[in-house]
């Protein structure tokens, strides 16, 4: 799977399904579930490393975990899901040259075929444009952008008319810059629908309703492994309680033997 294949999916009205992964096991499970895209998201800072936000994640962390995820893929290369890696905080907000260097390290050091960049501010636009010119495919991300939570919080975006117009403008800009797809996070469903209708590249929604060209979820949220669930992700099982109870049963039985 290549970034350009996602555009074909949109052209054919074929839904794109994506999950996050953070190690070999989660990567293998995602591949076996037949997802189209696996995102090594900076959410692994919280899911896997125990941080309270995505901000402490380093370039070295994301490279390490991307390689672990890719080792979980067992299908033929052409049949594997598209592997996309988040650029961590301050690896692309530090100027074009450094951003190219850091994104280049991700692509060179892992099997990722694209990077994801949050935001569409003028400085970020320059970075995205430069990365794409250098041959590095970029997935955009607008709406709720977790790396900006110190300024914007983690609240739903696009609630005001002004905010909606900005998000629509940002989406158009990202398409013109050459992004192959855009993540739309935690925004009104009708806003996401309008953006989806106006773009020729696919939109991947998370907390943005059902009209996007695809859906992505943090796997740990979907499996109910976290104590704090985002309001837009309903777990399909209560995994943490299930695993805890089963492990406790085993511990108790072993103590009796």
From Swiss-Prot:
Subunit structure, as described in the record: Homodecamer; pentamer of dimers.
Alphabetized UniProt keyword annotations: Cytoplasm, Magnesium, Metal-binding, Pantothenate biosynthesis, Transferase
PANTHER family linked to this entry: 3-METHYL-2-OXOBUTANOATE HYDROXYMETHYLTRANSFERASE
Protein role: Catalyzes the reversible reaction in which hydroxymethyl group from 5,10-methylenetetrahydrofolate is transferred onto alpha-ketoisovalerate to form ketopantoate.
Any single Pfam family the record assigns to this protein: Pantoate_transf
Domain of life: Bacteria
Pathway recorded for this protein: Cofactor biosynthesis; (R)-pantothenate biosynthesis; (R)-pantoate from 3-methyl-2-oxobutanoate: step 1/2
Species per Swiss-Prot/TrEMBL record: Prochlorococcus marinus (strain MIT 9312)
Cofactor binding, per record: Binds 1 Mg(2+) ion per subunit.
Cofactor: Mg(2+)
Gene: panB
Cellular component terms (Gene Ontology): cytoplasm
Residue numbers annotated as active site: 185 (proton acceptor)
Matches recorded under InterPro entries: Pantoate_hydroxy_MeTrfase, Pyrv/PenolPyrv_kinase-like_dom, Pyrv_kinase-like_dom_sf
Annotated residues for binding of Mg(2+): 42, 86, 118
Name of the protein described by the UniProt record: 3-methyl-2-oxobutanoate hydroxymethyltransferase
């Amino acid at each position: 799977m290549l970034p350009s294949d996602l555009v074909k999916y949109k052209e054919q009205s074929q839904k794109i399904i994506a999950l996050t992964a953070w190690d070999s096991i989660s990567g293998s499970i995602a591949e076996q579930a037949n997802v189209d895209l696996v995102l090594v998201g900076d959410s692994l800072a919280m899911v896997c490393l125990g941080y309270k936000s995505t901000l402490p994640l380093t370039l070295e962390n994301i490279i390490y975990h991307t390689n672990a995820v890719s080792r979980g893929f067992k299908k033929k290369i052409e049949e594997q899901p598209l592997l996309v890696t988040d650029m961590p905080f301050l690896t692309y907000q530090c100027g074009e040259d450094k951003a190219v260097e850091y994104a280049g390290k991700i692509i060179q050091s892992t099997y990722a075929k694209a990077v994801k960049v949050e935001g569409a501010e003028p400085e970020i636009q320059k970075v995205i444009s430069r990365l794409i010119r250098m041959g590095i495919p970029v997935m955009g991300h607008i709406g709720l952008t977790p790396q900006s939570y110190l300024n914007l919080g983690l609240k739903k975006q696009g609630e005001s008319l002004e905010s909606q117009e900005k998000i629509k403008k940002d989406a158009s800009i990202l398409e013109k810059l050459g992004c192959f797809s855009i993540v739309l996070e935690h925004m009104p469903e009708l806003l996401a629908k309008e953006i989806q209708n106006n773009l020729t590249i696919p939109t991947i929604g998370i907390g943005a309703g059902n009209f996007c060209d695809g859906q992505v979820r943090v796997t740990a949220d979907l499996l109910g492994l976290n104590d704090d669930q985002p309001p837009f992700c309903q777990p399909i099982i209560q995994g943490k309680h299930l695993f805890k109870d089963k492990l406790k049963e085993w511990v108790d039985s072993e103590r009796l033997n």
